[in-house]
């Protein structure tokens, strides 16, 4: 039995609020159960130096957690003067996943900057961030079209992207781990896929006990099922 009482293949309650903030070109509040993340997509003229005069745009991501998004307050990374390795890893994951969904040539020499701010954490913050940010990007691209930054016929969005966590908890593969499960799981895996059914990234780690190829296949099957439900629900 899972702590939440959910079935092994059951997602948490999923809710999306578009236009959650006033100023960003695209903004979404995404909620997976008690995990809540604000995802914004800001359009900035120009590109980094390594993209200058390439005719292509760029997409990059930042990720952070509010001090009391977790059970115990933690100091802001800005106050510590250094990002943690975890934060840097998650930022790179979000950026990689989302760049796979956008035709950077089609947005011209503009940069889409993603900000994912966790306001409440209960497991799965990185996967919620990816899913919410993909929705925010779609809204930002629509904003660009409506405001003459892109031709209305342009289609920079190659696909949508969603992500979910799976794992082995009490020797059973489970979908969409909350904090209680994640902190006690024998295996934790994050799966990122696009709306075309393609796999973008898989991160899987055994926690003190290895997992078999059969267990991997079961977890991947759960992830595919969950992501399909996410696309059907919020995209």
UniProtKB/Swiss-Prot annotation:
Residue numbers binding phosphate: 86, 124-126
Highest taxon listed in the record's lineage: Bacteria
Keyword tRNA processing assigned: yes
Catalytic activity line of the entry: tRNA(n+1) + phosphate = tRNA(n) + a ribonucleoside 5'-diphosphate
Any GO BP: rRNA processing
EC class name: transferase
Gene3D superfamilies: GHMP Kinase, N-terminal domain
Key words, A-Z: Nucleotidyltransferase, RNA-binding, rRNA processing, Transferase, tRNA processing, tRNA-binding
Entry's EC annotation: 2.7.7.56
GO molecular function, one term: tRNA nucleotidyltransferase activity
Similarity remark: Belongs to the RNase PH family.
Complexes and interactors: Homohexameric ring arranged as a trimer of dimers.
Function: Phosphorolytic 3'-5' exoribonuclease that plays an important role in tRNA 3'-end maturation. Removes nucleotide residues following the 3'-CCA terminus of tRNAs; can also add nucleotides to the ends of RNA molecules by using nucleoside diphosphates as substrates, but this may not be physiologically important. Probably plays a role in initiation of 16S rRNA degradation (leading to ribosome degradation) during starvation.
Protein name, UniProt field: Ribonuclease PH
The organism's taxonomic lineage, starting at the top: Bacteria, Pseudomonadati, Pseudomonadota, Gammaproteobacteria, Thiotrichales
